[in-house]
C-alpha cells in the first residue's frame, strides 16, 4: 500500500507555483498560506490561486475570476445585448443562439439580420479569395498557354 506524502501547511522553502500532474489529478493544490515575511503579505496576494475538482476534472483559476475579489461582471441576463436596456422585472427575455438575451423580438430580429449580413459578407469574401487563388494557380501552372490575346495567324513579310 502506497502512502502519499502531504506537504506541510506552512512551507519554509520558496514555492515555484507549479503543481504536478499527480497532485492535480488528486485534487491537491498549493496551500493558501505561506510562511513569508510580513512585508510580503502587504505586497502580494496570498490566497489559493487554483482548485481542481477530482470528480469533474475541471480546473478553476481564481486569478482570472473577478467575482472572487468582490467586483464581478454583471450576469449575462441583466441587460439586452443590443440596446443594453435592463432585463428582468418579470418581463420576457428573448434568447438568440442560446446565450444572447434581448428585451424584445425587434432587438432579437435586428441582431439576427446583422449576423446574417456579416456571415454573407464573410462567405462572399471567402469565395472571392478562393476564386482568385484558383485563377492564380491555373495561370501559373501553364505560362505558355494563350491568355485570350487577339492575334492573327498567317504569313508575315518583312522588308
UniProtKB/Swiss-Prot annotation:
Keywords: Metal-binding, Zinc, Zinc-finger
Induction trigger: Down-regulated in response to mild as well as prolonged energy depletion. Down-regulated by the glycolysis inhibitor 2DG. Up-regulated by glucose, sucrose and mannose.
Residues spanning the membrane: none
Highest taxon of the lineage: Eukaryota
A biological-process GO annotation: response to sucrose
GO molecular-function terms, A-Z: kinase binding; zinc ion binding
Positions of region (Disordered): 113-159
Stretches with biased composition (Basic and acidic residues): 113-122
Zn-finger region bounds: FLZ-type: 75-119
Subunit structure: Interacts with KIN10 and KIN11 via its FLZ-type zinc finger domain. Interacts with KINB1, KINB2, KINB3 and SNF4 via its N-terminal part. Forms heterodimer with FLZ7, FLZ10, FLZ11, FLZ12, FLZ15, FLZ17 and FLZ18 in vitro.
Membership in a protein family: Belongs to the FLZ family.
Role description: May act as an adapter to facilitate the interaction of SnRK1 complex with effector proteins, conferring tissue- and stimulus-type specific differences in the SnRK1 regulation pathway.
Protein's recorded name: FCS-Like Zinc finger 2
Amino acid at each position: 500500500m502506497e502512502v502519499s506524502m502531504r506537504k506541510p501547511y506552512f512551507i519554509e522553502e520558496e514555492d515555484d507555483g507549479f503543481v504536478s500532474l499527480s497532485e492535480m489529478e488528486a485534487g491537491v493544490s498549493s496551500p493558501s498560506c505561506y510562511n513569508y515575511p510580513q512585508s510580503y503579505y502587504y505586497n502580494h496576494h496570498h490566497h489559493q490561486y487554483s482548485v481542481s475538482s477530482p470528480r469533474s476534472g475541471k480546473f478553476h483559476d481564481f486569478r482570472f475570476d473577478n467575482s472572487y475579489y468582490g467586483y464581478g461582471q454583471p450576469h449575462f441576463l441583466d441587460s439586452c445585448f443590443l440596446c443594453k436596456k435592463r432585463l428582468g422585472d418579470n418581463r420576457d427575455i428573448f434568447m438568440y443562439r442560446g446565450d444572447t438575451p434581448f428585451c424584445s423580438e425587434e432587438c432579437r430580429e435586428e441582431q439576427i439580420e446583422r449576423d446574417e449580413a456579416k456571415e454573407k459578407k464573410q462567405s462572399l469574401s471567402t469565395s472571392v479569395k478562393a476564386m482568385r487563388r484558383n485563377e492564380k494557380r491555373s495561370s501559373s501552372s501553364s505560362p505558355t498557354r494563350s491568355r485570350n490575346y487577339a492575334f492573327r495567324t498567317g504569313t508575315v513579310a518583312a522588308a
